[in-house]
């Protein structure tokens, strides 16, 4: 199963784009920091990940999402490649909420 629930802080201004097929894509970058148990010890965890929310009516998020706000994103991980072919994991959010 490919499912991720991630809370974090919005680290860049959200950007809304429309694909050639007319689908809206809201682009976010979320940073998460926490302490996680591993092998009987506490480990500092840090992740910065691109998040994409796709669908209709996403314009309202641009006013709500400000740099530094806390969000919960839930969805699946997908591999993207940049123009040079460098791979990266992107969270394709199916649910997004301010917390």
Predicted features, each with a name:
Residues 1-99:
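Single-stranded nucleic acid-binding surfaces, predominantly the OB-fold ssDNA-binding core
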